[in-house]
Amino acid sequence: GGKRIASGDIGAGKSVQMTEEGKPIKYFYGYNVIGIFQNEAQIKDYNERAAASTGNAGQQYQNNVGPGDLIYEDVDGDGYITANDRKDLGSPTPKFIGGLGISASWKGFDLSIDFQGNFGNKIFNAKQVERFSGSDNWDRSFLDRWTPENPNTMTPRMTLEGNNYQVSSRYVESGSYVKLQTVELGYTFPKSWMQKVSVQNLRVFFSGN
């Protein structure tokens, strides 16, 4: 008991999920993002508090960061960020899975609609974790990236440094959804009409999903 099993490797030694006793199977495991560094003064303030907390004058809160980089939560309270600050970021298992069927009829017409959905789970958007490089196409989300002129965003600056591309809550999204599964619209011709052509019953319908 108590052994942790990492899984969900996305490359570069990064595991997305963790399994351990007393927790949901393969819950998402990473850093919790609490903001974006806005300027050097803010970074200096975090570093000074880290130094005071540890008694090490050279201690940084996070290594290799600049304005526009993600700020991670100091979960274990030691004053600076290490791998020990990773935490449970949510489960991929839905809390509820269900469906809903609705049907109605009127003067020979009938309509059936089925919905399907699940709720309460998380998904990990690995596509967003890919590090930006000059040889790749830019994802559209980078249009809203942090710049001094665009500080009110949660998309970090564009950089080759790996700090922003750690497994973190930034890439964990809601997996809840409701979708229209099937629709069927039909019409049953009156029996008085069908008797004239020696047909007992006739129904035409259109369906889609």
Annotated model-derived regions:
Residues 1-90:
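Conserved small-residue
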Residues 108-113, 192-193:
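Repeated loop/turn-to-beta-strand initiation elements of outer-membrane beta-barrel proteins
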Residues 13-43, 140-154, 163-167, 196, ...:
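C-terminal beta-signal and terminal closure region of outer-membrane beta-barrel proteins
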Residues 87-91, 171-174:
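Outer-membrane beta-barrel domain signature
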Residues 67, 118-207:
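Extracytoplasmic gating/loop element in the C-terminal half of outer-membrane beta-barrel translocons
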Residues 1, 105, 116-118, 207-209:
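Outer-membrane beta-barrel pore domains and translocons
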Residues 1, 110-112, 119-123:
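Flexible loop/turn segments at secondary-structure boundaries
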Residues 96-102, 109, 180-185:
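Hydrophobic, lipid-facing positions within transmembrane beta-strands of outer-membrane proteins
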